[in-house]
């Protein structure tokens, strides 16, 4: 199948479901667009049926068995169940309302093929159709979505139409409102699906063709078709059929919402309807972006209003329905990189589509909450369709490329939510006499009665006095009677033309009326507005003026196709066969006359096209000549057909003379003669116009030839002037040659200087990088030196404390020794004196002496330990001093290298100045002007000096800061707090520099603090729970999901509350 994936996939888990009927998930239509307007405003009454309220007459009956737990992704929150939709029929009497059981919107997905740009970019296929009702993710197979139908990249638009739109069109012809619209991101294929082109028509042309085919197949009913075409551009409604209808307003009455002042046109054939679309497309707003050269910048709504009633005496009321074909503009992201007006347009498009998503989300919740239909013009016009008062078919166009993964996923989520909206479609019927088709039918019958009375000689509304005056006039003279008869004939002719025009506006199937005459529908290739009595030719010219040059050729091709139909159907053989079968009835005769009029209209249309091509042939006469010749051949062919029809009318008139009365025969002959005279006169006018156009074409060709001759003469004069210049003085040539050689040498020198300049710039950048590395190493060394200085100061403090303590201990030791010596001396003296006196207890004295000797040993040991500790500290201090000296040497070496780099940089700037001076000197030789380059050199030298001074000053400041830091680090411990503060200050300066760089990098993106929906207001809201800071206040209140991660918003934090 065309919609299945090109690769082998696992069978869909939904393959067990029964296939739905053509009305499966049938969509509802908006009966409230321009719509909900059953009739023109002048004919609407309060008694008309209100579609928005659901009080409609007639319905279709349908039994549905549906089990849907959820429309979310499979493997996620829920799955789809089986669906069964039996055949349905239309049931309902006048004045009754029979509603069907609940159904859902029909949702189809169409994949477009990957573009050449995506292949070149290296994109891969991420989303693919699995079977014919499933969309699955390549990298996460559990993420899948089920819909009514999924079409692959190789599918065609007719296949999409047969599934998504044809059931809606068929139901609309039976009285049920219908809406078909395409949804997707920019460049996903929405406009191609809805409009198509000449080779591959889209949904709208196929639907129009299908409508007229159904009319042709439906016997016993009369149809009246009207169309309107509008766009919503920047939340402003514009009428595309009427360029003056700008900024229209939406109104409401008992029938629902409608657009005030919208223009409605009666259409008679598919070509006629397509001509209005082509004329409207000329006024539609389009623009270019990064993805599409002609991107739609507005939403368009093409509405086909259908009225039908039973033919003849079987009238049972008028059935009214509307078919809305909508082409939505694509949602845009920051990838489009639009600015100015395009960004403003994208903001309005995103707001309307965001509101549409919010409305669909509210409708799928199933709660009695407020639905914000009035937040956008689009949702207000789609209110009745989304509320479920008709069939709705949603066609989602997506791309499988990996670069649009999130956009495709969001589109699939939108389609999944829309699938859960329930609808209750019903058949519409108008029982009153306010329908336009009924008004036309009554007027036709009244005019026919008046014509019969005129034929019988009975004037309606003529009093007895008027009859007496007529008798007196008859007696007065034959001349007055003749004038009166002529006036009556004119009145008859006017009534007949009025009847014919009103009859033409009503489309009736000709399947069983005249065999061999009409194939599909009456070939009314004309543009006629409802309620206007202008002539057919002028109306044709008006509709032709609405079309653009681009659409003229397509309309001309339609006219050629219709003329080919007439050629096949109205051949002389067929006419002779029909004449041999029997005498034509008056209705058949009138039908032939209508054919003649239609051919005259087509001839006028071709003539206007020929005029436009002649005007365009001034730019390209060769290519336009073939088209002009083809149009002339078509006009001659139509003239031949008109002559054959007139001959057929004449033959049928001769055949009917024997069976008609003399008065009727005379009237017919007079009428036919008048018509023939008119047609001959029109043919003469057309032939005269053709001759004039040919003469104009010949004059244009002669003028073109004259211009070619003038160009040739000018070229000859130019060559002669060149030859004259080549014969100038030899000295001048030599001087010029010398100058050229000098210029070439200067150019060569300039190229060399440029190369040297490039090399110097590269060397400069390398030196800068090296200088930066050295600066980093110097800063690191300085930091180490400062740390070592602090540690050295701490050690010096400790050594000082220990030396003071040692000195104190030495003093105590000396004092203790002195004290011990004095005590020992006294003890010895006392012992000697005591021994001498009485010899008392020497042992005790020995113990005291022993104790004193023990204390002295302990003090000596402690003093030695302290001396050893002092020696260790002095060694550590010496080591610290050595390390500090090494760091100082490294810092001095870094300074020397930095100074050398600065000198090299200054020399490079001098070299650059010299190069600039040399370049300016070369330019001065070429221009022979020495004053200005000298000034430029001076300015360059001044700039270089200023830059060198600035660099030196900056380096001096940096060196000064470093010297201050080192000096502070080498000071006494009294300035330790100052060193700490300086170190903290340097750390703060580094942090500020890093923050400024981060801020500059953040500000590089102009859209980083701009709302991701409207692209206008700054971001002011933090979304919870994802905590993304990406929306302004108004857009955050309107959104239900985060535009970045698509998580549901539970709460909002406003960063800048008012």
Curated annotation (Swiss-Prot):
Domain of life where this protein originates: Eukaryota
SUPFAM superfamilies xref list: P-loop containing nucleoside triphosphate hydrolases (SSF52540), RING/U-box (SSF57850)
Ranges of Low complexity composition bias in the record: 23-49, 824-838
Gene3D superfamilies: Kinesin motor domain, Zinc/RING finger domain, C3HC4 (zinc finger)
Annotated Basic residues bias: 8-19
One Gene Ontology MF term: microtubule binding
Record flagged with keyword Metal-binding: yes
Compartments in which it is found: Plastid, Chloroplast
Any coiled-coil regions, as ranges: 422-509, 621-658, 704-826, 873-904, 935-999
Polar residues bias: start-end ranges: 50-70
Binding residues for ATP: 184-191
UniProt feature, compositional bias: Basic and acidic residues: 558-570, 927-946
Region (Disordered): 1-92, 549-578, 824-847, 922-946
Transit peptide, residue positions per record: 1-60
GO annotations of cellular component type: chloroplast; microtubule
Assigned keywords, A-Z: ATP-binding, Chloroplast, Coiled coil, Metal-binding, Microtubule, Motor protein, Nucleotide-binding, Plastid, Transit peptide, Zinc, Zinc-finger
Domain Kinesin motor: 104-421
GO BP of this protein: microtubule-based movement
Protein family (similarity comment): Belongs to the TRAFAC class myosin-kinesin ATPase superfamily. Kinesin family. KIN-7 subfamily.
Protein name per UniProt: Kinesin-like protein KIN-7M, chloroplastic
